[in-house]
Amino acid sequence: MVEKKSPAEGWPVVNGDYIVGDPESPVAATTLASHIEDIPVEAGAAIAGPCKTENLGIEKMIANLISNPNIRFLILCGSEVQGHITGQSIEALHQNGVDPDKRNIIGATGAIPYIENIPDEGIERFQKQLEIVNLIDVEDADAIKAKVKECIEKDPGAFEEEAMIIKVEEGGEEEEGEEVKPVAPETALIEARMRNIQTQVKMIGSTNRMFAGMYSGKVQGIMIGLAFTLTLGILLLV
């Protein structure tokens, strides 16, 4: 039988719109924009609930996950959150972390993907403790339950370190308490395209500098060749 540990006292440590199951289960699920949190819990998940924003919403989720070392799998299921692109932001955070200065999630395509209330050690713990299971845009109950049970069968046991407790400013319900304005899908798409354009401009600039250097080298070579030819011609005439 795999080893289990006690979650933080009073777990879950952050209030939210979720359902709690067996705290010793190795599985947690975020249902993103969908309210189907009962499905994972019925299949044996420790906790399940929506996560609608790519900043404070993710921070609250992480605080509840790393404060229970028994949770080793995070299933991303339900409809992706339009504009915020929360599911993809969670994957990017787990894979890439955040920029140490700007605190933005590296590689996230959401509108405001910033993690300001979770320190680096909390993000690192999230990355090490959890394995991400991608079922984004899947709402089929049978598929979700099957994946929960599959993860339970692969339970590696509790994470080697004890529960990590991080305080996150709650500010009420996620939809109302976060200082995040709803972002239309069109706006998020424009912002994502702007970021892509900026990247392409930087690449073009680098390419231009490279070709400029090559051109400068060619001109320099031609001038040296002409000077050598003229010098040789003068010497022959003399």
Curated annotation (Swiss-Prot):
Alphabetized UniProt keyword annotations: Cell membrane, Cobalt, Membrane, Methanogenesis, Methyltransferase, One-carbon metabolism, Transferase, Translocase, Transmembrane, Transmembrane helix
Induction of its expression: Part of the probable mtrEDCBAFGH operon.
GO BP, sorted A to Z: methanogenesis, from carbon dioxide; methylation; one-carbon metabolic process
Subcellular location: Cell membrane
Gene Ontology molecular function: cobalt ion binding; tetrahydromethanopterin S-methyltransferase activity
Pfam families in UniProt: MtrA
Catalytic function, reaction form: 5-methyl-5,6,7,8-tetrahydromethanopterin + coenzyme M + 2 Na(+)(in) = 5,6,7,8-tetrahydromethanopterin + methyl-coenzyme M + 2 Na(+)(out)
Amino-acid positions noted as binding 5-hydroxybenzimidazolylcob(I)amide in the UniProt annotation, renumbered to this chain: 84
Co-factor note (free text): Binds 1 5-hydroxybenzimidazolylcobamide group.
Cofactors: 5-hydroxybenzimidazolylcob(I)amide
Residues exposed to the Extracellular side: 238
EC id: 7.2.1.4
TM segment ranges: 219-237
Gene Ontology CC annotations of this record: methyltransferase complex; plasma membrane
Cytoplasmic face of the membrane: 2-218
Family per similarity comment: Belongs to the MtrA family.
Quaternary data: The complex is composed of 8 subunits; MtrA, MtrB, MtrC, MtrD, MtrE, MtrF, MtrG and MtrH.
Function noted in UniProt: Part of a complex that catalyzes the formation of methyl-coenzyme M and tetrahydromethanopterin from coenzyme M and methyl-tetrahydromethanopterin. This is an energy-conserving, sodium-ion translocating step.
NCBIfam families registered for this protein in UniProt: mtrA, PRK00964.1-4
Protein name: Tetrahydromethanopterin S-methyltransferase subunit A 1
